[in-house]
Amino acid sequence: LRFFEDSAPNRRRARIFMRYVSTRGEAPDLGFCDVLLAGLARDGGLYVPAEWPLLSPEEIRALRGLSYPELAVRLLTPFLGGEIDERTFARIVRESYAGFRHDAVCPLVQTGANEFVLELFHGPTLAFKDVAMQLLARLMDHVLAERGQRATIAGATSGDTGGAAIEAFAGRDRTDIFILFPHGRV
């Protein structure tokens, strides 16, 4: 992970070159878009960032009061490694969460003194997996369109992952999805 200072005075703009490595250490390092489409690494490992971006105390304070989409853009942009421009990414994020039933997307609700619950059920299928799946589907569609490619996704599940995936990928231009459910065991 490398940061470069912008030449403009009093303005720091980091250009980040993010690479992802396999947890098993036997697969080639990849950038964000390749990892997004690869899923698992060739060696069966998971791809993780080689290094994690750090936030200064000032940057953390600046997050206060942001909407969920604004917060997502601010925190996730470094992981893109410059492969998707920030304006496009912000649009994708806004579209991903526009269909949620609560303006806050995932509201933090106080239930008592020093007790809070993060509500993750306001997505289209009411499953917590909507939070990630809605963004994943749109990011994949964007990257596939940029590359002039299509993808077919096949999955099997006995829970709410399938419904969240089907809903997220429904109507996407570059993906088809097939989910298998065990008969009578969902």
Regions found by a protein language model. Give the residues of each.
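PLP-dependent amino-acid enzyme catalytic core
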Residues: 3, 17-186
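Short, Lys/Arg-enriched N-terminal segments with co-localized hydrophobic residues
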Residues: 5-17
